[in-house]
């Protein structure tokens, strides 16, 4: 008999971290820690995850595919050329067809509204593997990494430096829910979305944490326990690259900036990283960096999530 983390997630979707309670997140992080120690748990015999990718990926594809295999199931990779979505089939029809073939859908796409529609029309759970607005699986891995290194989440100060993007939105909401104080420094015109900021501030009031938004990276990293960076130009923004590099230059995480953080700060980055753009090689390859521990943790939190969504708690013999 395999143990099952108690969450409210069985059979449900994960579109943003707003879908999870503090108790759910704590349970998922505990389960992820267990799965990190005992990687192979063949509980998913006969279960299949459909993985829809409209944006390319290394970590998302490999971690979900390996995770399903380690849990005894299988994963189907579906690119745009494998589906009829790009040739006029509706999201609703795709959702209904896949619901008859597989047990869950993970989708990595551009428009968040597409994930919402897929979840509405599907009869099976849908997991957001990334949209332009949110990246909840990454934030779960971030929280696990912070907890592993700092030993706690409540009271930890996290500073995010750079574009107010999907990663920033999910990190901000996750930190606010779990009691981390988060400061986000972004240039004017590149701030986080109001809807994400307002949600995070509401959660922070409940958890006793704080959310600070600024355009000053030094202010953001002052006495920080964790410094987090992401690329200045995300997929789909290539036409803006030169403009962005100029605007974001003062937001590079380098030795001068991290000197304002705590001496034992931890550097995180969701990867892929562009060394000497958003972060210097000295920092990302230095002793305070935990980016590869963070990347590995994508596997473990996603396995915990899949187990919570798809596994009732039968013995592996009957699963």
Swiss-Prot record:
GO biological process, one term: arginine biosynthetic process via ornithine
Pfam family, one: OTCace_N
Annotated binding of carbamoyl phosphate, by residue: 57-60, 84, 108, 135-138, 270-271, 298
Enzyme class, first EC level, given as a word: transferase
GO molecular function, one term: amino acid binding
Protein's recorded name: Ornithine carbamoyltransferase
Pathway: Amino-acid biosynthesis; L-arginine biosynthesis; L-arginine from L-ornithine and carbamoyl phosphate: step 1/3
Gene3D superfamilies according to UniProt: Aspartate/ornithine carbamoyltransferase
Annotated positions binding L-ornithine: 166, 230, 234-235
Alphabetical list of InterPro entries matching this protein: Asp/Orn_carbamoyltranf_P-bd, Asp/Orn_carbamoylTrfase, Asp/Orn_carbamoylTrfase_sf, Asp_carbamoyltransf_Asp/Orn-bd, Orn/put_carbamltrans, OTCase_ArgI
Cellular component GO terms, alphabetical: cytoplasm
E.C. code: 2.1.3.3
Keyword terms: Amino-acid biosynthesis, Arginine biosynthesis, Cytoplasm, Transferase
Enzymatic reactions: carbamoyl phosphate + L-ornithine = L-citrulline + phosphate + H(+)
Species the sequence originates in: Bacillus subtilis (strain 168)
Protein location: Cytoplasm
Entry similarity comment: Belongs to the aspartate/ornithine carbamoyltransferase superfamily. OTCase family.
Described function: Reversibly catalyzes the transfer of the carbamoyl group from carbamoyl phosphate (CP) to the N(epsilon) atom of ornithine (ORN) to produce L-citrulline.
């Amino acid at each position: 008999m395999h143990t099952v983390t108690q969450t409210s997630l069985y059979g449900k979707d994960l579109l943003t971290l707003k879908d999870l309670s503090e108790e759910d997140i704590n349970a998922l992080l505990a389960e992820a820690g267990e799965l990190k120690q005992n990687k192979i748990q063949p509980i998913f015999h006969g279960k299949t995850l459909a993985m829809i990718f409209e944006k390319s990926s290394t970590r998302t594809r490999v971690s979900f595919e390996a995770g399903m295999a380690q849990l005894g199931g299988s994963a189907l990779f579906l690119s745009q050329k494998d589906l009829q979505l790009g040739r006029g089939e509706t999201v609703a029809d795709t959702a209904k067809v896949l619901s008859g073939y597989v047990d869950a859908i993970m989708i990595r796409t551009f428009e968040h509204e597409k994930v919402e529609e897929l979840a509405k029309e599907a009869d099976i759970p849908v997991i957001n593997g990334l949209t332009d607005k949110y990246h909840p699986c990454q934030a779960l891995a971030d929280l696990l990494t912070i907890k592993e290194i700092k030993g706690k989440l409540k009271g930890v100060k996290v500073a995010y430096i750079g574009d107010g993007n999907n990663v920033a939105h999910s990190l901000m909401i996750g930190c606010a829910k779990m009691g981390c104080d988060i400061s986000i420094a972004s240039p004017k015109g590149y701030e986080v979305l109001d809807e994400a900021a307002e949600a995070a501030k509401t959660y922070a009031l409940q958890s006793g944490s704080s959310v600070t938004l600024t355009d000053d990276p030094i202010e953001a990293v002052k006495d920080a326990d964790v410094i987090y960076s992401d690329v200045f130009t995300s997929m789909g923004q290539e036409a803006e690259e030169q403009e962005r590099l100029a605007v974001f230059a003062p937001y590079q995480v380098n030795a001068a900036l991290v000197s304002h953080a705590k001496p034992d700060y931890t550097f995180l980055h969701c990867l892929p990283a562009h060394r000497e753009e958003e972060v210097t090689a000295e920092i990302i390859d230095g002793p305070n960096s935990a980016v590869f521990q963070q990347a590995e943790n994508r596997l473990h939190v996603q396995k915990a999530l899949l187990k919570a969504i798809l596994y009732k708690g039968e013995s592996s013999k009957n699963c």
